[in-house]
Amino acid sequence: MKNELEFAKKLIDFIYDSPSPFHSVDNIKNTLIENGFAEIKEENKWELNKNGKYFVKRNDSALIAFTVGSGFVAKKGFKIIGGHTDSPTFRIKPNPEMVSENSYIKLNTEVYGGPILSTWFDRPLSIAGRVTVRGKSALFPETKLLNIKRPILVIPNLAIHMNRDVNSGFKINPQVDTLPIIGIINDKFEKENYLMKIIASELGEDIENIIDFDLFLYEYDKGCIMGINNEFISSSRLDDMEMVHAGLNALVNAKCSEATNVLACFDNEEIGSATKQGADSQFLSDILERIVLSFGGDREDFFRALHNSFMISSDSAHAVHPNKGEKADPITRPHINEGPVIKISAAQKYTSDSNSIAVYEEVCRLSGVPYQKFVNRSDERGGSTIGPITATHTAIRTVDIGTPLLAMHSIRELCGTLDHMYVEKSFEEFYNL
């Protein structure tokens, strides 16, 4: 249990230091550099080496890392693990300051993804993301990371005495009910550029140099290990940072194989992936083709490589809920700490089929990791993942898997300490094949 707890603590630290997709990618980048990976850029000509370790960023919120295999890539292909860096939250709108009751100052926000809104009330919140400032060229402004590392916001509940329906299905209006308060002002003129002044102070920038921002709310409190036997991890953003963390650790710990090992961390999965940095873009296929071209291959070699490749699409899965067991399939019922979950859908919301399932089952068998399966109830629609999207773009055989989770899309999700270690172990075995 000691190893599992140590690894779980590292996950909690990783998530706490990754309050936005931009910070997630920055932390991934730092870990990769510490382990001998070199950054390459899409705008440059690539000169890659066999057994070399590289990574590419896009939009500062998505990243693809890879270790070049020793074999001919057209024959040996790619072994890919994919996840995403974003989580449900609230994005801060432009000119967000709003004054209420001539006293409170609130921020105007927009829902990002599908959070369980009620879980965001009455919690210490903060702000993190990316700020764009003037650069040397109008075409190429500079960007800076911002993380206000203290609790500065709260979304207060309405007292039950004024909202008697709060415990019986109260409908939350995100334009009214979930706007966070940031403080109290004494003068209406204090409202002007209130947030911009905070940003400028945090970054040490002149306010005139700040052009725009991509800023989001996050829960300030750190995750923890809990349960009478330390069997649970409770944290924000387990979906999908736990899978990214497992994939990252597997990539840096794996031996160099004949195939090229790839870790793809996409942004914007929670809003459909249809962005230049999302899974529904050419990001992955562009990088894979450029790897082939860098070693003298042509487009036919690229298609051959795709045919000889395999991908694990890794996104959190649903565990059976202890209080709502009837919401799960009557037969297929994943439990926390009983291993990673293979996700299956007749409608191909998950891209797993018998061939790709067999591959991952063998990976688990070779690594000594238990596994489970998940299907939705036949009267529940369920969600989807990056798996069907990337498979559509690349035609790579793909399996959808994930760590079983409770309270998915809550501000505070719950998974198992054993499961996180299980997933990493299976990923490392996959990369070592």
UniProtKB/Swiss-Prot annotation:
SUPFAM superfamilies assigned: Aminopeptidase/glucanase lid domain, Zn-dependent exopeptidases
Positions that bind Zn(2+): H84, H161, H409
CDD domains assigned to the protein according to its UniProt record, in alphabetical order: M18_DAP (cd05658)
Name the UniProt record assigns to this protein: Probable M18 family aminopeptidase 2
EC number per UniProt: 3.4.11.-
InterPro entries documented for this protein: M18_aminopeptidase_2, Peptidase_M18, Peptidase_M18_dom2
Keywords: Aminopeptidase, Hydrolase, Metal-binding, Metalloprotease, Protease, Zinc
GO terms of biological process kind: proteolysis
Gene3D superfamilies: Aminopeptidase i, Domain 2, Zn peptidases
One GO CC term, this protein: cytoplasm
GO MF annotation, one: aminopeptidase activity
Catalytic EC class: hydrolase
Family: Belongs to the peptidase M18 family.
Organism: Clostridium acetobutylicum (strain ATCC 824 / DSM 792 / JCM 1419 / IAM 19013 / LMG 5710 / NBRC 13948 / NRRL B-527 / VKM B-1787 / 2291 / W)
Cofactor field: Zn(2+)
